[in-house]
């Protein structure tokens, strides 16, 4: 028996166009957006998808990918003093304490902890700049010419930028990593800090995880300069759709539109 898929993109595009006739499209509120089918990388919908914008904390998708590819989840990370007190969301790490890399990744991807992202950077890259070079090398390996990182957390920088399309491709690559998928699809996680003496519970900032069973991630972001940024992914019957919006004041609505559309996707057929 020969197995083949129906033309997923044709079906997705058709259903998407039908659904959004009665609901907002994912581009209504965003300056830049894209929806892609993960397996092929084909674009289903786009709006200024190749315009360079600040990614804010969606930067951390690449941070986690580089960390997982260059270290072990059971590695013990000694917190570098330079990571402590990093501006923005925080895990309130203390200099010298020892934390599992996996716990730092949960703090980064669920709690958006900037100090945890910095701690990972110092541990793996030796410095913020060194780790950013690793992130940029990984982006280059993916063929992404409109992405450049200055840091692992997404705080604003003059040469810290990406595009909706590039960010979708980064998420697409990251979702191939089983550890990454497990982390970003987790709703809440208790992690051990202060050398195991303190337990802190991180709740995923991605509210879509709590609304739809098919949502599998990925990451929220915000700075005053970048506005609201969001990368989400939904999966059903082996088809995964990734949605990215940048500078979107109504991102939850826009991503719900895509999720609703995805719930009506056809299954794979066998001939």
Residue spans for each PLM region:
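Bacterial N-terminal signal peptides that target proteins for export
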Residues: 1-9
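Domain-terminus/edge residues, biased toward the C-terminal soluble/receptor-binding domains
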Residues: 144-145, 156-263
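Active-site-adjacent loops and short helices of periplasmic peptidoglycan-processing enzymes
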Residues: 21-165, 169-178
């Amino acid at each position: 028996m020969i197995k083949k898929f129906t033309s997923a993109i044709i079906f997705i595009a058709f259903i998407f166009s039908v659904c959004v006739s009665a609901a907002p499209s994912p581009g209504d509120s965003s300056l830049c957006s894209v929806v892609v089918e993960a397996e092929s990388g084909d674009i289903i919908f786009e709006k200024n998808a190749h315009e360079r914008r600040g990614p804010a904390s969606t930067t951390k998708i690449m941070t986690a990918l580089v960390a997982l590819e260059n270290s072990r989840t059971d590695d013990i990370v000694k917190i570098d003093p330079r990571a402590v007190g990093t501006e923005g969301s925080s895990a309130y790490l203390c200099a010298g304490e020892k934390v599992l890399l996996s716990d730092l990744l949960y703090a980064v991807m669920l709690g958006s902890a900037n100090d945890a992202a910095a701690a990972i950077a110092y541990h793996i890259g030796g410095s913020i700049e060194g780790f950013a070079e690793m992130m940029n090398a990984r982006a280059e390996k993916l063929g992404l010419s409109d992405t450049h990182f200055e840091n692992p957390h997404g705080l604003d920088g003059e040469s810290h930028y990406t595009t909706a399309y590039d960010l979708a491709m980064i998420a697409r690559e990251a979702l191939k990593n089983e550890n990454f998928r497990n982390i970003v699809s987790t709703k809440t996680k208790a992690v051990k800090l202060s050398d195991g003496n303190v337990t802190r519970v991180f709740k995923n900032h991605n509210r879509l995880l709590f609304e739809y069973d098919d949502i599998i991630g990925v990451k929220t972001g915000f700075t005053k300069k970048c506005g609201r940024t969001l990368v989400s992914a939904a999966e059903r019957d082996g088809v995964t759709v990734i949605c990215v919006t940048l500078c979107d004041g109504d991102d939850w609505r826009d991503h719900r539109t895509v999720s609703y559309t995805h719930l009506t996707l056809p299954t794979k057929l066998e001939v």
